[in-house]
Regions:
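Bacterial N-terminal signal peptides that target proteins for export
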Residues: 1-10
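Hydrophobic h-region of N-terminal signal peptides that target proteins for export
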Residues: 14-22
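Alpha/propeptide regions of enzymes that mature by internal proteolysis
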Residues: 27-30, 34-40, 48-62, 67-68, ...
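Extended, compositionally biased flexible segments
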Residues: 69, 73-120
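Intrinsically disordered, low-complexity linker/loop segments enriched in Gly/Pro
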Residues: 98-101, 106-118, 129-219
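Conserved mixed alpha/beta catalytic, RNA-binding, or beta-rich assembly cores of soluble enzyme
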Residues: 184-295, 307
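Long, compositionally biased
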Residues: 339-362
């Protein structure tokens, strides 16, 4: 094992392992981005829009996001949520405004995305690190929605089955029923840079190399997501906010609930050139990803990413990396419902006597 490891996705700087492990203090919020009709798109991700906000690398932004649930029918959000006893003053005004004024493009997807955020200095071949400092629910309720064509069992239900679920944010649980409570673990289902120029515009439904709808429930506060950059400025979008979701997201949705995210954006020059897929990290694990229409192919990709990571970052031989992946790395299904499916690998940091310092202890 090397004595000093490169910071994950090397930036040309080495970080000594003797540095104290204390987490960095919460950064100052440099800008805010509200989810208004002029700062959101509905159902797609594109490299062909002017920035909703321009920032410098290292800056932190407080971003409002809006769930699409309650915005997809003929009735407006206030009427939709009133059916479950949600008072009108608890329905977000920006959700009502978006429903009334933002057009949906036929054939694309359902997600309302805030952005794009243009990060100065980001260029193709770089890597954008998104540090998730805080995720705060904006409403005390969420929606799980399924139906006859939804999820991994599309023939199971004969009728749409929307379920509006109250959230107890003081106790940090979702009140699924009188005798079932689910611990909350908010995260953003979609975090994405703009796709490559040869693609230009994509539906927000399938995840891919630029991130997108990865529905990865490990991306809670205290985690980092690493995305390859394909365009000048990176052009970051986010949305599809979740209060909690299990691996697989098997009926097609989580508890979908609007939230405010505090995110820090850091450009790592040249570090995206060799990236095949996004990666992630938290205080306890490194995460690799594989995506494909075929879950078996996604599994092979996630395994290959894991082997490559262990070789590149820890100096293992191919044989040892493959062996370690088999005996110590768990592979799980992040989501199996977005046409393109995603497998992730969990590499425990505790396997290694020495690992680089991470910014968060959570």
């Amino acid at each position: 094992m090397v004595k000093i490891l490169k910071r994950w996705f090397a930036t040309g700087l080495l970080i000594a392992l003797s540095c104290p492990a204390a987490a960095q203090p919460a950064p100052t919020v440099d800008a805010t981005l509200a989810s208004r009709p002029e700062t959101v798109v509905w159902g797609y991700i594109t490299a062909d829009l002017p920035p909703a906000l321009t920032i410098k690398s290292g800056q932190t932004v407080k971003i409002d996001t809006v769930s699409h649930q309650g915005l997809l029918g003929k009735e407006d959000p206030a009427a939709f949520f009133a059916s479950a006893g949600i008072a009108k003053d608890q329905v977000l005004q920006d959700a009502i405004d978006i429903y009334k004024t933002v057009p949906r493009t036929k054939g694309l997807s359902v997600h309302v995305l805030t952005g794009p955020i243009y990060v100065e200095g980001a260029a193709p071949g770089d890597m954008l690190e998104v540090r998730i400092h805080n995720l705060e629910l904006r409403v005390p309720y969420g929606v799980n929605n399924s139906g006859p064509t939804s999820g991994v069992l599309p023939g199971l239900l004969s009728e749409p089955a929307p379920k509006i679920i109250k959230l107890d944010t003081k106790r940090n649980v979702a009140l699924f029923s009188d005798d079932i409570e689910v611990p909350l673990a908010p995260f953003l289902g979609i975090m994405s840079v703009a796709p490559s120029r040869d693609v230009l515009l994509v539906s927000s439904r399938p995840p891919w190399r630029w991130g997108g709808n990865i529905d990865f429930n490990k991306l809670v506060a205290g985690a980092s997501l690493y995305l390859p950059v394909f365009n000048t400025g990176a052009q970051f979008y986010t949305g599809d906010p979740h209060a909690v979701q299990a691996d697989g997201e098997v009926n097609g949705t989580a508890i979908e609930a609007s939230l405010t995210a505090t995110l820090q954006f850091i450009v790592h020059k040249g570090a995206g050139k060799a990236m095949n897929w996004p990666r992630a990290e938290d205080a306890t694990h490194y995460y690799t990803m594989g995506m494909d229409l075929d879950l078996n192919v996604a599994m092979r990709q996630a395994t290959r990413e894991t082997v490559n990571f262990l070789r590149e970052e820890f100096g293992l031989s191919t044989e040892d990396a493959y062996a370690l992946a088999s005996i110590a790395v768990d592979f799980r299904v992040a989501e199996a419902v977005d046409s393109v499916q995603m497998i992730y690998g969990m590499i425990p940091k505790k396997l290694f006597k020495q690992t680089p310092q991470f910014w968060s202890k959570r």
